[in-house]
Amino acid sequence: MPTHPLSRNRFTGFSLVELLVVVAIIGIIGTIAVPAVGSLMKGSALTQAANLITDQAALARQYALSRNRVVEFRFYKIADPEQPGEDATKPSTGYYRAFQFLEIAEQGIPNPVGKIVTLPNSVIMNPSDTLSTLLGAASADRKVTTITANDPELPRGVRKNYEYVSFRFLPDGTTNLSPTGTTNGLWFLTFHILGDIKKATDNQPPPNFFTWMIDPVSGSSKILRPGLAVKK
C-alpha cells in the first residue's frame, strides 16, 4: 500500500505570537482572580472570628449558670512582633486579639477554665470608644494594665506582656455590665481585618466587619454583620 508522509504541520509547535497571547490571557485571569480570592479569605477569617466569640461567650455563661459561679470574660490586648510597629514586650503597641473566661474563686483569685482563644492572624477588635464600648472609655474601670502574680501567662511567648478588659457573668446568667449609663445598655465589639484599620474612623467601621453585641441583663449575645442575617 502506498504510504503518505506525515504532514509537517502535525509537529509544528506554538508560534511566539500564540504563546504571548496565552501568557496575556493568564495574566488577565490572575488580575481578576487574586482580589476575589483575597476577599474570600478575609470573609472566611471574619466568619471564623464571629463563631469563636459567640461560642466562647455562650460557654462562659453556661458555666456560670451550671456551676453557680462568677465567671470573668477577658479580652486580651497583645502585640504581634510580626506586625510593623508592634513590640511583643509592649502590649500598648498591639491590639485586642484574644479572649478567655475564668472562674473567680471566693478569694477573688481568677482560675482559668476556658482556653485562651486567639483570633485569626488578620483579625482584631477595634479599640474605638464608639465602635467597641466594651473596650472604650465606658469600660475604663474594668481595664487592667498591671498584671499580677495571680494572672495567667499567655502562650506563644506572650507570657504576661498583655493588658485586658473584662466583664463578668453572674451565677444567674446576667452580667455586671450596666443596662443604663453612658452606653445606654449597648455593649458591643467591632471586629475587622487589621489591614483595614486605616479605612475605619472613630465612628465608622471599614466596609468589611462584624459587630458582636451582648445583652447586659440576659447575658445572651448576637452577631450583626452587613448583608447577613443576625446570628444568635
Segments (PLM) and residue ranges:
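N-terminal helix-rich module
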Residues: P2-S7, F11-F14, I32-Q62, S66, ...
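Alpha-helical hydrophobic helix detector
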Residues: L20-A36
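Internal alpha-helical transmembrane segments of multi-pass membrane proteins, especially GPCRs
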Residues: T12, E18-V21
